[in-house]
Every structure is written in structure tokens, then in C-alpha cells.
């Protein structure tokens, strides 16, 4: 879980003066299309489409973001987008499906996923990097986890009947498409 949190929220540190080096996560490396919204701004379908267009303009025709990571509150807001569609529901099914998993704009197709470590009001106190909801849009194949040392289990001294061990490894976030990515924060609690 610490690795997953660091990939999203890590803060860059060079490791001088006796502190350990740390990497910048997605919220730290996305700078070209990073903005803070006015307090209480609500995420709209038009704004979503505008962000996708800006990503397409900065990254080129094949490089608009294709994965959106948002906290649960914003995912619920996106679930309410209609994209001008009419929904037909079989009445005998007695089931209404609302979640939006894929959204298509003129800039391309994007998968929408709620993520527990994207800054938002629904994050736990221990993991909240911000008190405002954030939106991350990335081109998935332009980001990779690069291992400096592949994780491995290292056994430690035996303690009674218990065998102790630890997982050791080093990694960093490799990013090749920062210009195509979007990071917006400051959305209202209800999206």
C-alpha cells in the first residue's frame, strides 16, 4: 500500500542531510496541465471534455489521457454524466445501472476509475494529501514503475516459534508523457 500511495502522492526528496531519497508521484510530476480550481467548483461534463481536449492539444492526436483516477466523490459525479445519451432500460429487469466506466470524447476514449489515494475528502486522515477532491488524467502506457531493486523477501532473525522477514526493494515512477496528463484539484465535496 505504501508503494501505491507513493506512486500517486509521493513528494520528491534528494536524500541529502540524513534523510532518505523519495520519488515524486503523479501529483508531483504533472505540471503542464496542473491547475487548482476555485473552492467549491463542481466538476461538469463540459469541463471533463475540455480537459480531454487540452490533453489532446498538448500531447498530440494519439496521446490524450486514457485513464482517469478520481476519489469516490468525483466518480459519483462522473457517473451522473449523460453524454447526451438516452438510456433504454428493460422494465422487467428491475435494475438501473448508473456507473460510467468508459467515457468517449472527440479526443479519445478514457477509462474512469475511483482510486483511494487520489487526494480527496473521502481519503483517510493518514493518507489525505489535500482536503479537496482531485482529478488525474494520464496516458497509461506512458507511465511505468521502474525498479532499481526488484522486491524480494529477506529473512530476519528467528524469534521463538515465529519467523521474521521483510520485503526489500526500490522503485521510481518513470514518466514519458507529462504534457498529456491532467491534474486538477479543488473540486467541491460533492463533486
Where are these regions (language model features)?
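Short, glycine/acidic-rich hinge or "gate" loops at secondary-structure transitions
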Residues: 1-22
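Sequence/fold signature of self-assembling virion shell proteins
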Residues: 18-50, 77-191
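Short, basic/hydrophobic alpha-helical segments
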Residues: 49-61
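Conserved active-site beta-strand-loop modules that form the wall/rim of enzyme catalytic pockets
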Residues: 64-67
